[in-house]
Amino acid sequence: MSYNGSYHQNHHSTLQVKSKFDSEWRRFSIPMHSASGVSYDGFRSLVEKLHHLESVQFTLCYNSTGGDLLPITNDDNLRKSFESARPLLRLLIQRRGESWEEKYGYGTDSDKRWKGISSLMAQKPPKRSYSISNPEDFRQVSAIIDVDIVPEAHRRVRLCKHGQERPLGFYIRDGTSVRVTERGVVKVSGIFISRLVDGGLAESTGLLGVNDEVLEVNGIEVLGKTLDQVTDMMVANAHNLIITVKPANQRNTLSRGPSQQGTPNASEMSAATAAATGGIQRPMKMNGSSDGSYHPKQHDANDSDSGED
């Protein structure tokens, strides 16, 4: 757009924008009566179309009245950029990751100018600059859920796998567990975590441990299922795996409030069952554990082990 007589007549009714991407410049105008209703998404789409950036990840910045280069990331700071257009909104478009301000922080240019020569005479070493980028692409990778539903001795964990960048990172095996029933304590087959892979998702979250017993996979109880069936269930739900486990180390389970302290534990239920049936109460061997939790014995080398999930 050229600055001629018609511009001087109409510049009060339009917002003039001058955008720059690499060595490419564009000039366009936005009617002032509609500028207040322009959304960030609509403005970004307009810039994207003018500079043909459909396949380019880019950031938008503008020169404020104080001389700082500030980002445009939402409707609020887009409106601020319109207010600072005196008389022209200077827009800088950069590829994502190439911006100096994106790496070291926005709004630091005016601070350097006002310090002047005093910054050169400072005796103290400069503070370390931290790289704080725009908040985006945050993804949940793990969480403990249903704390108010799951029994105190159990833990329900959600593992979220994004793409193929990192495996779930744990192996499972079959073994023998115990259950407290009306007939007393009985041995049943169970599924246990046998190994955690270094750098895997399960190891990095710290929510799963070796010898933890797997009770449910995405709401489906694993009791009575084979090792291959449980493995297939985990692989099918790998991108949003919800696994309920009984941790081998009960010291790391979440403690409940005072209202939950009256709930009998497994040993008390076992004692009550033995007394009711007239049996003899004997201490149950816990594989060397002193905290009352059940740690399944390690199997031999010929134990079956699922592939890495």
From Swiss-Prot:
Which Gene Ontology biological process is one annotated for this entry?
A: cell division
Query: How is expression of this protein distributed across tissues?
Result: Colocalized with par-3 at all stages in early embryos, at the anterior cortex of the embryo. Patchy expression observed at the periphery after completion of meiosis I and in meiosis II, which on completion of metaphase II, is restricted to the anterior 85% of embryo length; this decreases to 55% in embryos between prophase and telophase of the first mitosis. During the first cleavage, expression is detected in the advancing furrow. Along with pkc-3, is unable to associate with the apical cortex of cells that lack par-3.
Which Gene Ontology terms of cellular component type are present? bicellular tight junction; cell cortex; extrinsic component of cytoplasmic side of plasma membrane; P granule
| Record Pfam families | PB1, PDZ
The molecular function terms of the Gene Ontology recorded here are: protein kinase C binding; small GTPase binding
List, for all copies, the residue spans of the domain called PB1: 14-96
The record's subcellular locations are: Cytoplasm; Cell membrane; Cell junction, Tight junction
Q: For the region Disordered, what residue ranges are annotated?
A: 249-309
User: Which UniProt keywords are listed?
Assistant: Cell adhesion, Cell cycle, Cell division, Cell junction, Cell membrane, Cytoplasm, Developmental protein, Differentiation, Fertilization, Gastrulation, Gonadal differentiation, Membrane, Tight junction
Going by the entry's taxonomy, the superkingdom of the source organism is recorded as Eukaryota
- Which Gene3D superfamilies does the record associate with it? 2.30.42.10, Phosphatidylinositol 3-kinase Catalytic Subunit, Chain A, domain 1
Q: Where is the composition biased (Polar residues)?
A: 249-270
Q: Where is the PDZ domain?
A: 156-249
Is-annotated flag, keyword Cell division?
yes
Query: What membrane topology was assigned to this protein in its record?
Result: Peripheral membrane protein
Q: What is its main location?
A: cytoplasm
Which residue ranges does the record assign to the Pseudo-CRIB domain? 132-149
Phenotype on disruption: RNAi-mediated knockdown results in a diffuse distribution of early, recycling and late endosomes and Golgi bodies and reduced intensities of markers for these organelles.
State how it assembles: Interacts with par-3, required for its peripheral localization, and with cdc-42, required for the activation of a par-3/par-6/pkc-3 complex.
Family of the protein in this entry: Belongs to the PAR6 family.
- Function as written in the Swiss-Prot or TrEMBL entry: Necessary for apicobasal and anterior-posterior asymmetries associated with cell adhesion and gastrulation during the first few cell cycles of embryogenesis. Required for localizing/ maintaining par-3 at the cell periphery. Regulates mes-1 expression and/or localization pattern during early embryogenesis. Acts together with par-3 and pkc-3 in maintaining epithelial cell polarity in the distal spermatheca. Plays a role in endosome and Golgi body positioning.
Name of this protein:
Partitioning defective protein 6
Which organism does this sequence originate in?
Caenorhabditis elegans
From the broadest rank down, the organism's phylogenetic lineage runs:
Eukaryota, Metazoa, Ecdysozoa, Nematoda, Chromadorea
